[in-house]
Amino acid sequence: MQTIEIGNKAELQACKFLHTQELEILAHNFKALPYGEIDIIALDKDTLVFIEVKYRSKTKFAQAEEMLTYSKQQKLVNSASIYLQHNPQYQDYQCRFDLIAINESNINWIKNAFGVI
């Protein structure tokens, strides 16, 4: 399976999981050039959640949770800013950055995976 297909499958699995947790999916693979994309944007009651999905099929060398680098965090923050510029109806919402880490077949949802000053 190609890397993109694996990523899409993991993101679909994450979306299904988030639906079971009663989050409303607003966007999937939101492109925010030049920074990249946000895997999933969702509403958790009155909080706007920007979600990065990381998948590892083998955890011998690293867990999916370890793959969210500082550089990626900065790209997510910048991408979230662009999303808010394009969607002013969410400007007054609380925002949160979460990580969905999928290791083999286990899903770990880390709320507030990193903070923003």
UniProtKB/Swiss-Prot annotation:
Domain of life, per lineage: Bacteria
Signal peptide positions on this chain: none
InterPro entries linked to this entry: Restrct_endonuc-II-like, tRNA_endonuc-like_dom_sf, UPF0102_YraN-like
An example Gene Ontology molecular-function term: nucleic acid binding
Family note: Belongs to the UPF0102 family.
HAMAP family named among the record's database cross-references: UPF0102
NCBIfam families linked: PRK12497.1-3, PRK14682.1, YraN family protein
PANTHER family: UPF0102 PROTEIN YRAN (PTHR34039:SF1)
The protein's name: UPF0102 protein FTN_0424
Organism (species): Francisella tularensis subsp. novicida (strain U112)
